[in-house]
Amino acid sequence: MNPPSWVLDTNVIVSGVLNPHGYPGRLVDAIIAGTLRLTLDDRILTEYREVWARSKFSISRAQLEAIFSLFLNQDLVTPPPLTTDLPDPDDLPFLEAAQLATDKTFVTGNAKHFPKARRRGATILSPAQAWQKLCSRRPPPEGS
């Protein structure tokens, strides 16, 4: 079974790298393990880079490069533009990319930024919901 490819909001990626013990951290671990892939476009990559470059994270250049090497072998897409109003227009690239993700799945800690009527069929999940969905896709261990 091929791993799903989902869009992860910047807040989920950052939280997962900084705190590997929560659900965002488990999702980042799944990306590293290859049991989850990222769907992203150049605008999302740019946002990831800009956020990580902020001094408040105190991350070394080597750590930053290790994080970004992870993103290079994911599912880079060029989604068609959507016409929908979101509370934060900067969130639109994530919703657009989600249209091309497995099950149109977008994982965010800010679901309120994506009102149901404006999601264009995308499934918005919290990190905990995403982890549960990912675990339900996995085959049971051999011998069980």
Name each model-derived stretch:
Residues D42-R43, Q63-L86:
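Acidic catalytic patch
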Residues T35, L72, T102-D103:
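Residue-level detector of structured alpha->beta connecting loops
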